[in-house]
Design a protein with these regions (language model features):
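Bacterial Sec-dependent N-terminal signal peptides
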Residues: 1-21
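Sequence/structural signature of beta-propeller domains
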Residues: 16-280
Length: 280
């Protein structure tokens, strides 16, 4: 967690949750929740923690109670987001890259059939690298290779980067890789820039079940994209939903086409909640 960002959030947070409705306080086991996902194959809300925590995939009820804690047979280098496909398989984004120097970026596929296992769960590793990174780390003006956001769509995984370039924090580059085991070079699709400030960092993403709406999360707002052409998700209309609440928001997913789940990390006893947001 970036100390500057934490200080900024603590100074600007309040007891009000703005446009967000609190559903539950997250349990202590998810104090550093970094990814959230739902799908039509389970009634549970799936969540993971940030890097440095146990390699576990948690299944929660809608009131925030842990119903499953699955042990994943892979290191949590820096797990940052969750996604799922129409078959119910879960994908874990192990691509957090604060220093822009990782050479082992990966997405871990957890089979839907293994979600009822009691022992350690094996995964399929989908490794990738960015086509335009050749130094690890690059110079400060080229720190564009961190990521905390992705989703699955039409047999591909779409990854949204997080800029660590001062004055360009709100920029995100969209990349695509095949959703299959192996080593891949990511394909650049397009870019979007919301604002230059640090609280515009993109920290999570999701796509609606019908594929007609995507959402990007930052500390202070949700960006909704509609009317786009095929998979150029930034080609349509972009609508910002201010949250009127600033915290370290780390994860977002669709509950249904007009309702979102959002979570934030607990810091100094503040936040660490599961929220609901209506965007219709």
């Amino acid at each position: 967690m970036n100390k500057f960002l934490l200080s900024f959030i603590l100074l600007t947070s309040s007891c009000s949750t703005g446009n967000l409705k609190v559903i539950a306080d997250l349990p202590k086991a998810l104090n550093e929740a970094s990814g959230i996902e739902t799908n039509n194959h389970s009634d549970l809300i799936w969540m993971v923690n940030d890097g440095g925590n146990a390699s576990k995939l948690f299944g929660l009820s809608s009131d925030g109670k842990i119903k499953k804690a699955l042990k994943i047979n892979a290191k949590n280098n820096d797990w940052e987001d969750l996604a799922s496909d129409k078959e119910g398989n879960i994908y874990i984004g192990d691509f957090g890259n604060n220093a822009n120097k990782r050479k082992n970026l990966a997405i871990l596929k957890v089979s839907v059939d293994s979600l009822n296992n009691k022992g350690k769960i094996n995964i399929e590793r989908i490794s990738f690298n960015y086509p335009n990174q050749n130094k690890f780390p690059p110079k400060k003006k080229h720190l564009y290779f961190d990521s905390e956001a992705f989703f699955h769509f039409n047999d591909s995984l779409y990854i949204f980067t997080k800029s660590r370039v001062k004055g360009d924090f709100g920029k995100t580059d969209l990349y695509r890789i095949p959703a299959k085991q192996g080593k891949h070079i990511a394909e650049h699709v397009s870019s979007f820039n919301s604002c230059p400030e640090i609280d515009c960092w993109i920290t999570s993403a999701d796509i609606s079940d019908d594929g007609k709406k995507i959402v990007l999360l930052n500390s202070k707002s949700v960006w909704v994209f509609i009317d786009f052409k095929e998979t150029d998700f930034f080609s349509g209309k972009a609508i910002e939903f201010p949250l009127n609440h600033n915290s370290q928001k780390e994860s977002i997913c669709f509950k249904n086409k007009n309702t979102l789940y959002i979570s934030d990390e607990k810091a100094h006893g503040v936040d660490g909640n599961l929220y609901k947001l209506e965007i219709n």
